[in-house]
Amino acid sequence: MTPIRDLAHIKAYAEIRAGQEAKKNGNIGKARVCARRGCGIAIEYWLQNHPEKDWGESAISMLTKLQGDQSIPKNIRDAAERLTIKVDQNFETGIEEDPLRDGETIIEYFLNKNNLNEM
């Protein structure tokens, strides 16, 4: 890994670890937020090597935009969709999900050297 990619990996997985702690404490909402932030870090790094993509500045906008990008594998787009589904008044999405697993899937895809086209 390049030093900057190493840093992105460390920061993204720090968010996943924070999410695991939140989930362990029963706070699945915070776990989802941490997963999205970790994804945002990885996607932001990837976007540096894909300047043609205009996916916005926030993790939510990046996750939303990637859902419609057919050049991204369906399993990654599906994981992004699950992470951006709105919760109901009980803070539930109505689908079975593991936001941390979805986050890890997205992070691994966007930090995989084969997907980076590093300049």
Report each predicted region and the residues it spans.
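Hydrophobic alpha-helical packing segments in soluble, helical-rich domains
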Residues: 31-49
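Amphipathic, well-ordered alpha-helical segments in soluble domains
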Residues: 11-15, 41, 79
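Short, charged, amphipathic alpha-helical segments
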Residues: 29-36, 97, 101
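Charged alpha-helical initiation segments
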Residues: 1-27
